[in-house]
From Swiss-Prot:
Pathway(s) of this molecule: Cofactor degradation; L-ascorbate degradation; D-xylulose 5-phosphate from L-ascorbate: step 4/4
Recorded family membership: Belongs to the aldolase class II family. AraD/FucA subfamily.
Keyword terms of this UniProt record: Carbohydrate metabolism, Isomerase, Metal-binding, Zinc
GO cellular component: cytosol
Chain's gene name: ulaF
Entry's induction text: Induced by L-ascorbate. Repressed by UlaR.
Residue spans crossing the bilayer: none
Protein name per the record: L-ribulose-5-phosphate 4-epimerase UlaF
Binding site for substrate: 26-27, 43-44, 72-73
Active-site residue list: 118, 225
Catalytic activity: L-ribulose 5-phosphate = D-xylulose 5-phosphate
Length: 228
């Protein structure tokens, strides 16, 4: 697990490097599918002092199997998503400014241009609000459930992120670093959408044929973007 702990540590350290977190407002995890174990950031530990050995290993029920700290308070959300989506290898949660602003507004981040379409096939959805019973019950678990409810039958790697109403963004990917990459993109396109709509409030969505081309040339069965 040491290699995975190092990867998760490095991915967590990327959050402040890319300006996605303030103080300790974020967490990254990754899963070892063969062992059924998840490595995640410890709760409330400052990035300035955090080490790879501080990462916490939990099983799929959330029981700590390795580590001296308590795992992130969002662990149950991560675990619920891993259980539902076998294609996920890493998950990240932040309170990055612009993506969180869309979450607080209760709005999906609209697909307005090709930067968005290179990574997200359509709008980045916003969940419904959690009920009082859901919040007072198993809050973090129910956060995972409302993400799954919102995604429905969508392929999660075609929509590698979401904003949770009145809370903030979650992103995911094939591994921890891919998840952070998608979180960075989400923050950037959230900022772009806010600026674009400020310039032109009547702005609608990117043309569907242009969105299809940009997404499929990177992620489709006949993708040709980048190097083999």
């Amino acid at each position: 697990m040491q290699k995975l702990k190092q990867q998760v540590f490095e991915a967590n350290m990327d959050l402040p490097r890319y300006g996605l977190v303030t103080f300790t407002w974020g967490n990254v995890s990754a899963i070892d599918r063969e062992r059924g174990l998840v490595v995640i950031k410890p709760s409330g530990v400052a990035y300035e002092t955090m080490k790879a050995d501080d990462m916490v290993v939990v099983d799929m029920s959330g029981k700590v199997v390795e580590g001296e700290y308590r795992p992130s308070s969002d662990t149950a959300t991560h675990l619920e998503l891993y259980r539902r989506y076998p294609s996920l290898g890493g998950i990240v949660h932040t309170h990055s400014t612009h993506a969180t602003a869309w979450a607080q507004a209760g709005l999906a981040i609209p697909a307005l241009g090709t930067t968005h379409a290179d990574y997200f096939f359509g709008d980045i959805p916003c969940t419904r609000g959690l009920s009082e019973e859901e919040v007072q019950g198993e809050y973090e678990l129910n956060t995972g459930k409302v993400i799954i409810e919102t995604l429905g039958n969508a392929e999660p790697l075609h929509t590698p992120g979401i904003v949770v109403y009145q809370h903030g963004p979650f992103a995911w990917g094939k591994d921890a670093h891919d998840a952070v990459h998608n979180a960075v993109v989400m923050e950037e396109v959230a900022k772009m959408a806010w600026i674009a709509r400020s310039i032109n409030p009547q702005l609608n969505h990117i043309d569907s044929f242009l969105m299809n081309e940009h997404f499929m040339r990177k992620h489709g069965p006949n993708a040709y973007y980048g190097q083999k």
